[in-house]
Regions:
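Bacterial N-terminal signal peptides that target proteins for export
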Residues: 1-9
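Short beta-strand segments
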Residues: 31-33, 111-113, 136-139, 173-177
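Short Gly/Thr/Asp-enriched flexible loops that form oxyanion-binding sites at enzyme active sites
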Residues: 112-132
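Conserved small/polar residues in nucleotide/adenosyl-binding loops
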Residues: 206-212
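ATP/NTP phosphate-donor binding region
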Residues: 24-99
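Hydrophobic h-region of N-terminal signal peptides that target proteins for export
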Residues: 13-21
Length: 212
C-alpha cells in the first residue's frame, strides 16, 4: 500500500510540475491571412506559385520548435495573397485582436501575411489595436514548397518576438529575415530579396540571431 501511495504521489508531483511548466509559457495566438508564406508551387525549384494555399495548422507542423517557446494556437482569417488585402479584412483583424486581448489569456499575437501590403496592415493595426501586448506580422519571400523557404524561420522568430516581455509597449512590429521593424517605419524595398523589409528612416528594434 505504501508503494502505491508513493507512486500516486510521484505521479501527482509529475503532473503538477508539467502543468506549472506549461503555465509559465506565454500564450501566443496566430491569425493567418495567407500570403507567400502559405504559398505552394509546382516544385521546389519553380519560382511561380499560388499564395495562401497552406493552412495555419500545416505551417505550424513545419515549425514544432515554437511549442518550446509558447503555447501556440492558430486560426485562419482568410487565405489570400496580400495584393487582395482590403479594409474589410483589416477591420476583421483589428476586431479579432482586440477581442483576444480583452480575454486576458492571450499574451501576444502573430499574423501571417503576404509582403505586398504588410506595411499597410501593420500601420493600420498600430492605430487600432487597444493593447500594449505584442502584435507581430510575419511573411516570406519564398513559398513553403521552395527549396530554400524562408517562412519557417521567420515564423519561429515571430513567435519568439511575440513571446518576449521586451516586446510589450513597442506597438505593432514586422519580423522578417531576422529583423524586427516598427510599423511606423517599415517598408518593402525589393520584390525578390529576402532582406526586403527595411526601415530607411528609422532604426530597427533588433536583429534576431538564429539561435534566439
Amino acid at each position: 500500500m505504501n508503494g502505491l501511495r508513493k507512486l500516486s504521489l510521484m505521479a501527482a508531483m509529475l503532473v503538477c510540475t508539467t502543468l506549472a511548466a506549461v503555465a509559465q509559457k506565454p500564450n501566443i495566438h496566430i491569425l493567418a491571412t495567407g500570403g507567400t508564406i502559405a504559398g505552394t508551387g509546382a516544385s521546389a525549384t519553380k519560382t511561380n506559385y499560388t499564395a495562401g494555399q497552406v493552412a495555419i495548422s500545416t505551417l505550424l507542423e513545419a515549425v514544432p520548435e515554437v511549442n518550446k517557446i509558447a503555447n501556440v494556437t492558430g486560426e485562419q482569417i482568410v487565405k489570400i495573397g496580400s495584393q487582395d488585402m482590403n479594409d474589410a479584412v483589416w477591420l476583421t483583424l483589428a476586431k479579432r485582436i482586440n477581442e483576444l486581448f480583452s480575454r486576458g489569456d492571450v499574451d501576444g499575437i502573430v499574423i501571417t501575411h503576404g509582403t505586398d501590403t504588410m506595411e499597410e496592415t501593420a500601420f493600420f493595426l498600430n492605430l487600432t489595436v487597444k493593447s500594449d501586448k505584442p502584435v507581430v506580422l510575419v511573411g516570406a519571400m519564398r513559398p513553403s514548397t521552395a527549396m530554400s523557404a524562408d517562412g519557417p524561420l521567420n515564423l519561429y522568430n515571430a513567435v519568439v518576438t511575440a513571446a518576449a516581455r521586451e516586446s510589450r509597449g513597442k506597438g505593432v512590429v514586422i519580423a522578417m529575415n531576422g529583423l524586427i521593424l516598427g510599423a511606423h517605419g517599415a517598408m518593402k524595398t525589393n520584390t525578390v530579396d529576402v532582406q526586403t523589409f527595411q526601415s530607411p528612416n528609422s532604426v530597427s528594434y533588433t536583429h534576431l540571431r538564429a539561435h534566439e
